[in-house]
Amino acid sequence: IIDVHEIDQIMTCSVWLKQVWIDKKLSWNPEIYGGVSVLYVPYEMVWVPDIVLYNTVDSNYNITISTKATLRYDGQVTWDSPAIFKTLCQIDVRWFPFDEQNCHFKFGSWTYTEDLLNLELLDSDARYELEMNENGELNNITIFEEGIDLSDYYPSVEWDIMSRIAKRRTKNYLTSFSDEAFIDIIFYLELRRKPLFYTVNLVFPCVGISFLTIVAFYLPPRSGEKVTLCILILVALTVFYLLLKDIIPATSIALPLFGKYLLFTMIMVSLSVLVTVISLNLHFRRPSTHRMPIWVKWLFLRILPKILFMRRPTLIKVDEAVRRVADYRRGYNMIINRYEQKVNCDSCRNVNKRITQEIQKIYRSPHVIKAFENVCFIAQLLKKKDREAMIDEDWKFVARVLDRLFLLLFSIACFLGTILILFQAPSLYDTRQAIN
């Protein structure tokens, strides 16, 4: 096997075609001719059957390599002709790169019908079956399990030969006179691709790139590289698609196995871009622009964190003393009374009375009231910022929960998708040994 060109669907093989027939006109008596029993003559000098390769894609149907034929005294003619055949081989890309192909060589006479030329295989055990022809009639066919001699076969670096069946059958062809029967012999080659090259250079890199999609959900939103990573993965997969286009034929019969995996990976990456955009949108939401719905709080702040084993970090709260200062308008009198009680005692009632009056003057002065109002404003501002910070942290935590959720979902999807798509090729479970 020289080459199997998938795009052009052509198989090129170098073969030895051995043909043996009896020509009584070429027999002689060796005793009369000095004991000569074998002659070697150019094949052009003797009659040769017009055996042609029906499914060739070359312009020459006949064998054109000039070799000599062997003539034996009893009229047996043996012609071993080396040739390079280019045959049409319909490529089945469904399981690429773990595919198996069935190619064949169809030989037969172009001129002589069944009555004039009989074709048989040499030295091979045969079995007989019935096959239905185009007219719905049953014809006898002869099947040879070892139809091709592989004793001098040079193993291909890309393909293994799994079987080499030959079939002899009779088929009717419409000629200029009538519908006449011709005998043809078809040699079938079942080839299984050696997947190591494409596994290392295509499958493994693509699997690695697809699992990089999971890393995008592990990046913190503040890094700003989540969408960039997803887009780069998408570009890398596009390059793999271009490589695949140059390897397999442009057929619409079936989608290649590797193409299915690439399509699955591109869908996953596209979804990851969408989810990443949603996650970034949630992360950078502010209380002034968005109000968190109740169901979002219930689902993303209570239920999912427990399922995903996530713990929310403790927030730094405003000091309680500042909160009490914020309640100045409501508890201002309580503050004054508290300080008045501190300076009241029975032993120094007169002095305390004077001190209390001074304290009341101080606490009720416009400057002190203004200072308390300013402190109250600052406290309210701190309370508002603290509340907004808590809501802001809620949105960020929702984004983290969403990332963790899709990190888990995409990990499961990528793993199961890789197993279910790539491991469905039948050749991976074919335990037959290749024919060496």
UniProtKB/Swiss-Prot annotation:
Q: Where in the cell is it found?
A: Postsynaptic cell membrane; Cell membrane
What does this gene product do? After binding acetylcholine, the AChR responds by an extensive change in conformation that affects all subunits and leads to opening of an ion-conducting channel across the plasma membrane.
The record's Gene Ontology cellular component field reads: postsynaptic membrane
Per the UniProt topology annotation, the Cytoplasmic ranges are: 281-404
Read off the Gene3D superfamilies from this record: Neurotransmitter-gated ion-channel ligand-binding domain, Neurotransmitter-gated ion-channel transmembrane domain
InterPro entries the UniProt entry points to = Neur_chan_lig-bd (IPR006202), Neur_chan_lig-bd_sf (IPR036734), Neur_channel (IPR006201), Neuro-gated_channel_TM_sf (IPR036719), Neuro_actylchol_rec (IPR038050), Neurotrans-gated_channel_TM (IPR006029), Neurotransmitter_ion_chnl_CS (IPR018000), Nicotinic_acetylcholine_rcpt (IPR002394)
Q: What is this protein called?
A: Acetylcholine receptor non-alpha chain
Q: Which residues cross the membrane?
A: 196-219, 227-245, 261-280, 405-423
Among CDD domains, the record links this protein to: LGIC_TM_nAChR
Chief subcellular location equals membrane
Cite the PROSITE patterns for this sequence: NEUROTR_ION_CHANNEL
Which residue ranges does the entry give as Extracellular-facing topology? Answer: 1-195
Q: List the disulfide bonds.
A: 89-103
Tell me one GO molecular function of this protein. Answer: acetylcholine-gated monoatomic cation-selective channel activity
Q: Which domain of life is it from?
A: Eukaryota
**Positions of glycan attachment:** 62, 140
What's this protein's family per the entry? Belongs to the ligand-gated ion channel (TC 1.A.9) family. Acetylcholine receptor (TC 1.A.9.1) subfamily.
SUPFAM superfamilies annotated for this entry?
A: Neurotransmitter-gated ion-channel transmembrane pore (SSF90112), Nicotinic receptor ligand binding domain-like (SSF63712)
Q: Which UniProt keywords apply?
A: Cell membrane, Disulfide bond, Glycoprotein, Ion channel, Ion transport, Ligand-gated ion channel, Membrane, Postsynaptic cell membrane, Receptor, Synapse, Transmembrane, Transmembrane helix, Transport
How would you describe this protein's topology in the membrane? Multi-pass membrane protein
- Organism of this sequence: Onchocerca volvulus
User: Does the UniProt entry include the keyword Repressor?
Assistant: no
Q: Please spell out the taxonomic lineage of the organism that makes this protein.
A: Eukaryota, Metazoa, Ecdysozoa, Nematoda, Chromadorea
